[in-house]
């Protein structure tokens, strides 16, 4: 009996140590580079279970000492119930210790948004969530790979529609700090750093009014998903303190969706200046422009390849009389329906344009990968209902399709760091079941 009690005492001491360790791990998880709601919940449960089981072991030890003394105080039935409770607590503790508190939850069937990384996502490593709450989108690296620019809406902070923010990429364990570089007036979209990393460009409607421009009433268009092409959008250059130093476009109608060439000398953007939604390339030094596309349909979201020899973009190509009629009617109201888009590539001057995807649905946010040969893009083509969106890799000739991300909501806007070692993207994952879209950074694994 003495040996049995000694064993219980040792188990009790061991569990006390486990409890202390669990509390320590919980504190580490709170300040670590893994700011996950799920991880915190597991650590809390782990700690609570350890504390409870330690208490039960202590109680059991005391009761057994008394029970087996010459003056038993519990009936046999009561003792059996206590032992059953004791065993249940042990089983609970064993189950809780099966989870490692700092390991990312990888439940691929999760529907509540509390998943940071899925087991099939083999290309992502050391994933970090940078923003928490609101709608954060189109996060893009600076040329030196040290900063991100992105657009953000967060009514809780008084940001009623997208404004432009920049932030330095944090070291592991540090918080992502960011500041607004747009005027705070109107709506902004599609920010990009300049080659000197001292300025940014972005499109803004602030010259058309201080308030957020109205969102289209989709009920008037059969509840279809539509994008507004606000005529007051123009493209501006600002310093990192938010002071506008130059207005880059000034044509009537929509001018937006700008990115820069690898050498920083050319800007490709979307405009309706010639009556359709087309791509234009501007020499930032001289201001000279060239129209790149001239086919009926929306052309936008264009990027140069890392080697500067090609461009890539998303486009719609209405073909039937009904499709053409609908496209023109929406365009006349400064609207476009982005529900049927494909990925296109061409030489940097717009020659030899060719279609890469032919999946139907919405295939968009394409960029070349670091090798300037493969492409990563977002698509909902696997789902007839039009959702979710995931990211895919495809060769320039349309072969070798590979699914990269697995969230049940929205994964899009991928961009690689200049050295090709990291990827940034925006996603609905790990949002606690809300509609928040946040920014995620990960090491890229080939």
Regions found by a protein language model. Name each.
Residues 169-172, 239-243, 283-287, 347-351, ...:
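Short loop/turn segments that connect beta-strands within beta-propeller blades
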Residues 104-125, 233:
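Blade/loop signatures of beta-propeller domains
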Residues 51, 89-90:
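Cysteine-centered motifs
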Residues 143-144, 195-196, 262-263, 306-307, ...:
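Residue-level detector of Asp-centered blade-edge/turn motifs that repeat once per structural unit
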Residues 132-135, 151-164, 182-188, 203-234, ...:
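A flexible loop/linker signature enriched in serine peptidases of the S9 family
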Residues 114-117, 126-159:
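Beta-strand-rich domains and repeat architectures in extracellular enzymes and scaffolds
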């Amino acid at each position: 009996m003495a040996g049995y009690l000694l064993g219980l005492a040792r188990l009790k001491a061991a569990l006390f140590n486990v409890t202390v360790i669990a509390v320590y791990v919980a504190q580490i998880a709170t300040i670590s580079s893994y700011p996950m709601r799920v991880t915190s919940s597991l650590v809390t449960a782990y700690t609570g279970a350890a504390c409870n089981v330690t208490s039960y072991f202590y109680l059991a030890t005391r009761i057994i000492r008394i029970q087996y003394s010459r003056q038993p105080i519990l009936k046999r039935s009561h003792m059996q119930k206590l032992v059953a409770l004791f065993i249940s607590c042990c089983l609970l503790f064993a189950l809780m210790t099966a989870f490692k508190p700092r390991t990312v939850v990888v439940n691929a069937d999760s529907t509540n948004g509390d998943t940071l990384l899925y087991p099939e996502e083999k290309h992502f490593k050391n994933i970090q969530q940078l923003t928490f709450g609101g709608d954060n989108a189109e996060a893009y690296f600076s040329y030196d790979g040290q900063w991100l620019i992105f657009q953000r809406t967060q009514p809780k902070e008084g940001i009623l529609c997208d404004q432009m923010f920049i932030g330095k990429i944090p070291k592991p364990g540090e918080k992502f700090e960011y500041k607004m570089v747009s005027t705070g007036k109107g709506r902004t979209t599609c920010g990009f750093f300049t080659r000197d990393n001292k300025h940014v460009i972005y499109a803004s409607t602030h010259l058309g009014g201080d308030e957020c421009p109205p969102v289209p009433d989709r009920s008037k268009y059969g509840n279809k998903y539509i994008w507004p092409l606000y005529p007051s959008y123009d493209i501006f250059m600002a310093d990192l303190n938010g002071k506008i130093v130059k207005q880059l476009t000034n044509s009537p109608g929509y001018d937006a969706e700008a990115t820069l060439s690898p050498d920083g000398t050319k800007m490709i953007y979307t405009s309706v200046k010639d009556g359709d939604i087309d791509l234009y390339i501007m020499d930032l030094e001289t201001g000279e422009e060239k129209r790149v596309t001239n086919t009926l349909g929306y052309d936008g979201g264009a990027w140069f390849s890392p080697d500067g020899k090609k461009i890539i973009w998303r486009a719609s190509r209405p073909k039937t009389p009904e499709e053409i009629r609908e496209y023109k009617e929406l365009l006349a109201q400064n609207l476009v329906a982005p529900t049927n888009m494909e990925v296109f590539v061409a030489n940097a001057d717009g020659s030899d344009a060719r279609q890469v995807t032919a999946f139907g649905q919405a295939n968009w946010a394409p960029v070349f990968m670091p090798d300037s040969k493969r492409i990563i893009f977002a698509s909902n083509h696997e789902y007839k209902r039009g959702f979710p969106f995931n990211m895919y890799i495809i060769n320039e000739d349309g072969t070798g399709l590979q699914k990269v991300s697995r969230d049940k909501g929205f994964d899009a806007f991928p961009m690689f760091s200049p050295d090709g070692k990291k990827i940034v993207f925006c996603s609905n994952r790990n949002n606690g079941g809300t509609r928040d879209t946040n920014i995620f950074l990960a090491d890229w694994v080939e």
